[in-house]
Amino acid sequence: MSRQINANTPVSRRRSGLRGRRLSYSPEDAVPTPAPRFSILEARRAADRPAEERMRAWHVIGDTSEPVTLRFVHNNAQYTVHGNAPFNTADFQEERDSQETEAANRAHQRAVHLHEHLHEVQETAAPLPNYSPVHSPDLTVMEDLETPRQRFETMFHAVDAESEDEAVPLPQVDMAVFCHICSCFFTDIKNYNSSFVTTSECNHAVCFKCYTSIMFDKELFKCSMCNRATPTCRVYNHKGFVELLPTRAVRDKQAIKTHWAQLLDNNMSDSKVPEQNDVQKLQAELAELRAEMASMRAEMASKQLGATMALENRRGSSSSGASSSSTSTSSSSSSSWLWECLLNTRNY
């Protein structure tokens, strides 16, 4: 009975376990030093003290039985120095200065990177149509801080402004431009269209028919003014320009006849506007000729009147009665003749 009790007791089991276990110890150098711990009594005392005293207990330097010699705050924590404990405030100050310096350096680096990024974005972006010289090109725009709604509104307003600019018609001014090769004038609308072909190298322009005749004989277009050869030429209008690159030239004398037959069938106007313009020009020339004829007749009449008056003055030395009667009759006859001339000029 006693053997059964001894076999079932937990003490015998623990002893048998200790007999079969091998304990190994590491050297003292490899064993880490345990961190200092508060005793249970000190933990209870710390729990009974108020929150401020508990915070201060964790930042006590020196023996608490000695009087307090220094108190200071570092990183929102209060430190208390007791007695002549080895302590130097410069350590805390240097640590604080180093942290502030590192934080300032990091902030400076972030600002430099942000400025470089914004400067690259401004260089690659195309200028807006509503650019104003008041805004400096070095101005930093914080586009990254805009919300998607603000970006959409700015894009919408920009597109709306462009549509309004396109809707306003520009004043059309007809200009007569001279070709240096064929000596022909071409009437085009200024800043809207052009009948000339311009080289991409020297910007000298020729009419399209001269460009065609030149390209039939040469593979490259050679400017007639500066003798510079260029493979491509440009034709401009109000939307932009089209580059012309000749691919082949086919010699066919019947092709131009076929082309003109198509023009006469499809591109001729049925209105009589050219004839009306010719009639108006002829009427204006006729009115000018009539005005010149009337002025010439009036000059001739005035000259004849002056000659007759001079003759009458020479004859008026004979007798007073006879001279007076003769001058009256002659003056009346001359005045009547002058009025007839003026009436005839008015009728014309």
Curated annotation (Swiss-Prot):
Among the GO biological process terms of this entry, one is: symbiont-mediated perturbation of host ubiquitin-like protein modification
Point out the signal peptide segment: none
Mainly resides where?
host cell
Coiled-coil region(s): 272-306
Query: What the entry says about post-translational processing?
Result: Auto-ubiquitinated.
* Family listed: Belongs to the alphabaculovirus IE2 protein family.
- What protein does this entry describe? E3 ubiquitin-protein ligase IE2
Q: Which gene encodes it?
A: IE2
